[in-house]
Amino acid sequence: NIGALKALAKPGDAITAVSTADGGHISHARMGAVGLRDLNVSTYPWDEERMEPDIDASCKLIRDVQPKITLVGQSVFLFPTPLRELADAAHEVDSTVMYDGAHVLGLIAGGVFQDPLREGADVMTGSSHKTFPGPQGGFLLSSSEDETFHRRLNNAMFPGVCSSYHLHHVAGKVVALAEFEAFGQAYAGDIVRNAKAFASSLAAEGFDVLAESRGYTASHQVLTRHGEIDSGAGARAAKKLEDAGIITNMNMLPGDTKAMSPSGLRLGL
């Protein structure tokens, strides 16, 4: 992400993004890469029932702020983002649309989530080690045919933020790409089916699973609420599960304001 931000914006520029409390990645906040690049961030109004940016209000924000970068994508990513609508608003004000697909890249590649570069994103970033099952690393992708734009992206990565591409990782990524080409579609489909079944089973057992009206999830993630806002119930639940040998992620849910005492868990399948 820092490479893309370096390519697309200068210090002091405006950016819009999902807030950390609503599922945005820490790199999208002042505490992370956005702050390192010294960008001024405005966060999207959030639709808590649909667990996505409020489309009309977010489009208005984009038109009002006129950000250099319209950043979409989250680390809590239950459903495809309403990308076409946000991208249309962004392009009206000459804003570059950046899609952070780190957590859902394998689902995108498997054809079971959304297709960001065909839905309006100018740039997509992604991890090679999450739902895409390869060695640690990342991808920076664009469908633009503008060679000047390509050079900006390439130069931001090297010599901008990376000095080596780690050849041993390249070999591992080649194997992962070959395996994904052969088995990725079925693999991605199974991930989403398993997550949906898991969420439904938790709900049937009485757990408070978010986004019931939308079938809980369309990705590999499931969110559960374990107490009141800022109660720390999510942290306590994560500790109990860790003691039982199950590693989960305490997570802020909409309304939470304290990262270390959130009310929820993020579960990944």
Question: Language-model features: where?
Answer:
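Broad gene-expression machinery/nucleic-acid interaction feature
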Residues: 38, 137, 221, 264-266
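Conserved small-domain helix->loop->beta segment predominantly found in fold-type I
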Residues: 177, 188, 192-238, 248-263
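Hydrophobic, well-ordered secondary-structure elements that form the walls
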Residues: 241, 267
